[in-house]
């Protein structure tokens, strides 16, 4: 037991928590913004899958990780706007649209990968891992001064570029939501669309903007998965992170800081599962750990929220007397 605890107290373990949390943070920010706009996007998983595939393919054919990243971002935005078109313009249930995107993200990406590689490589490939080299992946960054600090330097320095962008975007998204007119409009539309419309806010445009933002974040998350976390795209590589992000958004109370901390909790759970597997624990027992933590976290969040609601109702009842 003591040896296992020593493994958890290493800088490498904390470094892995941050690394694993990055794609969850991107997807959590996507969930937060659309929730502020008054609707849910459960298609985060599928959006990340499409972004991951397009990013890795464009990176290979353009021989540049930058163009691959740009392709992933564009894919995420365009597909999220397509979701918005079906939901807002055609009045399709947005939950059903999200389910459809998630299903397409699994089977559709595999189909596209096989078709594209068959046309360009002469054979159908079920993944792009054989195409992407280290030079085509998004680079890691070593922070000169911080890297020399004992323990902390090994935890903070040496991460992928997108990992630092994920944490920076937590701050920038919070500023956008609470310190800018756009953020005010997003929150107004989410709280009372009729009131927002009465003062000249275009509810439809704001919803499209929120949807586009969620797609942008999923683009970052997908690019991270196929061009940083792994070298290339493979089937179902997102592995439920889109759904975990929905849980992180709920646990974080719909706020950027809370969502980031919740994502780190889930990152810790996944890193713990990997450690358990490394020391010989059956993978069938280790792999469910992140999902068990997700369920436990949501139960705790629901209990705390319900307790707060009961206290508010009790206080309101006393004041009315």
Segment roles from a protein language model:
Residues 191-198, 202-205, 276-321:
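Cytosolic-side transmembrane-helix boundaries in multi-pass membrane proteins
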Residues 106-178, 281-286, 313-321:
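Transmembrane helix-bundle core of multi-pass membrane transporters
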Residues 12-61, 65-69, 73-74, 78-95, ...:
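Single transmembrane alpha-helix segments in multi-pass membrane proteins
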Residues 154-233, 257, 261:
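Helix-loop-helix "hairpin" substructures at the membrane interface of multi-pass membrane proteins
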Residues 218, 228-291:
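Transmembrane alpha-helical segments in multi-pass inner-membrane proteins
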Residues 36-40, 79-141, 239-240, 244-256, ...:
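Short loop segments and helix-boundary regions at transmembrane helix junctions
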Residues 95, 122-127, 160-165, 207, ...:
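Loop-to-transmembrane alpha-helix initiation sites
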Residues 27-28, 52-56, 106-110, 163-176, ...:
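Hydrophobic core segments of alpha-helical transmembrane domains in multi-pass membrane transport
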């Amino acid at each position: 037991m003591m040896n296992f605890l020593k493994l958890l107290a290493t800088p490498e373990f904390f470094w892995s928590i941050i690394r694993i949390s990055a794609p969850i943070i991107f997807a959590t920010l996507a969930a937060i913004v659309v929730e502020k706009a008054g609707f849910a996007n459960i298609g985060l998983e599928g959006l990340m899958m499409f972004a991951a595939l397009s990013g890795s393919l464009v990176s290979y054919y353009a021989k540049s990780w930058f163009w691959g990243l740009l392709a992933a971002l564009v894919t995420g935005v365009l597909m999220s706007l397509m979701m918005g078109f079906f939901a807002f313009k055609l009045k399709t249930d947005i939950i059903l649209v999200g389910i459809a995107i998630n299903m397409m993200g699994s089977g559709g990406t595999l189909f596209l990968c096989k078709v594209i590689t068959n046309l360009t490589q002469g054979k159908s490939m079920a993944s792009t891992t054989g195409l992407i080299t280290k030079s085509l992946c998004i680079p890691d960054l070593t922070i000169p001064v911080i890297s020399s600090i004992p323990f902390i330097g090994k935890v903070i320095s040496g991460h992928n570029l997108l990992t630092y962008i994920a944490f920076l975007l937590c701050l920038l998204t919070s500023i956008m939501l609470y310190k800018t007119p756009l953020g005010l409009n997003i929150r107004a539309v989410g709280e009372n669309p009729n009131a927002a419309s009465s003062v000249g806010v275009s509810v439809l445009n704001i919803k499209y903007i929120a949807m586009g933002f969620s797609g942008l974040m999923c683009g970052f998350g997908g690019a991270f998965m196929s061009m940083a976390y792994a070298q290339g795209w493979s089937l179902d590589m997102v592995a439920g992170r889109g759904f975990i992000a929905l849980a992180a958004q709920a646990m974080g109370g719909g706020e950027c800081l809370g969502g980031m901390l919740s994502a780190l909790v889930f990152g810790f759970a996944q890193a713990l599962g990997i450690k358990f597997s490394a020391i010989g624990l059956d993978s069938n027992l280790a792999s469910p750990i992140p999902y068990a933590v997700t369920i436990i976290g949501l139960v705790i969040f629901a209990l705390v929220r319900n307790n707060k609601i009961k206290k508010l109702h009790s206080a309101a009842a006393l004041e009315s007397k």
